[in-house]
Structures are given as structure tokens and as C-alpha cells.
Amino acid sequence: MKIAVGVATSGRRKILACMIDRLAAQTRKPDHLFLSPATDEDIDMEHLRSVPFPVSIVSSPKGSCPQRNAIINAAAGMDALTFFDDDFFPAANYLAETEALLEADETIVVATGHVIFDGIHGPGLQAGEADRIIREDPTPDPAPAVVPAHNAYGCNMTFRLQPILAHRIFFDEELPLYAWQEDVDLCRRLSPYGKIVAFNRLRGVHLGVKAGRTSGLRFGYSQIANPLYLVKKGSVSLKWALRLMGGNIASNIIGSINPPPYVDRRGRLRGNLIALRHLLLGALDPRHITNM
């Protein structure tokens, strides 16, 4: 089986280099690494000279969806493609366990792993902290448990490429920039063609680095516009979208009272309100964030 790793990156040159070092330490190396940077400055080319697998730099317009789609097209000769965020550190056996999972069950089309610690919910982690958490993982090799999942978590997700290419199911480029919930959309559109699973032996740490993320205002708008756009296109249910939006609005209202320094809750709440106003006016569109 040929397994590629794809990373769409923007504004995280140093942490990307650290993440590539963790890929180089995998017990089962990727057969190819495809990097899609937002700009030429996002990649340390000198650092890539020493990695023990082929690397290709893939050009595309800026945005999570077009960058990832460019990687999919470039990786067409592979059997599977694992997308890692540039701030996700996989445990050393991640790709070995991925290969074993896909070979054991050919009906799996999407697999996601267990995030031991997710820095997105706090101020973020440094590389050394993430390495320590992986070393101290209390259950590094748990009894295998493969369970059905609604969708993969975008920081670590593996796709069998044949269904994507055969049915032309790509990331939706109408979701611009950070493209919040693009992982859910793609998974739900792939669900008729096989299983979507979470596997507890695919383990790693999401650092939740704050550099390179979209503004609070833009993200708040996407928290309303993107779920409703997915409802309209039929990839998710209205119930799912309302629950997601309601939770985010409530968090932003509460968080705006005494906001933490690492989350722009007030900016997100403003974005929520602008989106709700656009909804009432019939003008809601995920693409509006490009003008904010």
C-alpha cells in the first residue's frame, strides 16, 4: 500500500519544520509528502533536504480547500492520503497503524485518530510539550477499537483515494480561507461509498498554534455561514447545524464577558451577529469573509 501525507500550510514555517521531523521519525515512513504552502515563505526548503522520503511542493490559491485539493490531485497515484495539520504531531506508529487498519478492512474510506491532547482549546502548546504528552501517553497501544464516526477531525484524517477520484468528491472551494467544517462536508459526501471510522490506535497531539489562524471576526461569521451553507447543499442536517451554531454563539457570548487572551471571543461574536443579520437579509454567504 502506498500512503502519502499531505499538509496544507500557511504562516507556520517553524512549526511545520518540527512536524516534518516527527514524520521522519515514523516507524512506517510516508511514501511521499505533499506540501501545499500559501506562500513561498511558508516552507524551509533547506530543511527538506534531509528527510527520508520524497517531497513535492504543490502550488494552489491560498485557502484550506484549494490547497488540499491540489494535494489530492498530486497524490493520485497513491492508495491513501493522510492529511495532517501543520501543528499536529503524530505518534511514531501512526502511519503503521493506518496501513494495518486500511489493509484489514477495505470498506473503510475515511479514518481519523485519537487526539491525546488538543491545544486548540487553550493557549496552544510548544513542540516540547507535545512531545512530552506523546511520551507520557498512558495508553500508547490500547486494545484496538474501530468505531463509526460522523466525520474525521481535520487535523488528522486519512482518505482512501479511489472513491475521491472516481466520484470527483473534493473539498468545497466555496468555503474560503480557513474553510471551517470542510472536513465534515467532505466526509459526509464520501459516506455513501464506505465506512467513516475513528481508530484509537491512531494517536497524536494537536498543538493548536495560534499563528496563521483566521481573525475572530471572520471565524465568527463562518460559525454561522458555513453550517447553513452545508445544510443548503445537503451534506449535513439542520439539527446538526443548529446545535453547532447554538453552542458557538453561547460560548462567544459567555466568553466575551472576560475573554481569554488566546481567543478573540468578542470578534467571533461580532462575526456571529453580522452573519445573522445577513441571514435575515437573505445575503448570507461563506465567501463574505474574504472582504472582512
What is each stretch, according to the model?
Residues 130-150:
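Short, flexible, basic/aromatic active-site loop/helix in glycosyltransferases
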Residues 20-59:
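Acidic donor-binding segment of Leloir-type glycosyltransferases
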Residues 93-126:
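Conserved donor NDP-sugar-binding/catalytic core segment of glycosyltransferases
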Residues 65-80:
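Active-site nucleotide-sugar/metal-binding loop of Leloir-type enzymes
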Residues 217-226, 236-292:
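Non-catalytic, C-terminal membrane-associated alpha-helical segments of glycosyltransferases
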Residues 7, 11-25:
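Short, well-formed alpha-helical segments that are part of the catalytic scaffolds
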Residues 152-159, 163-168, 173-202:
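A short, conserved alpha-helix in the catalytic core of glycosyltransferases
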Residues 178, 195-217, 227-230:
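Active-site donor/metal-binding and catalytic loop motifs
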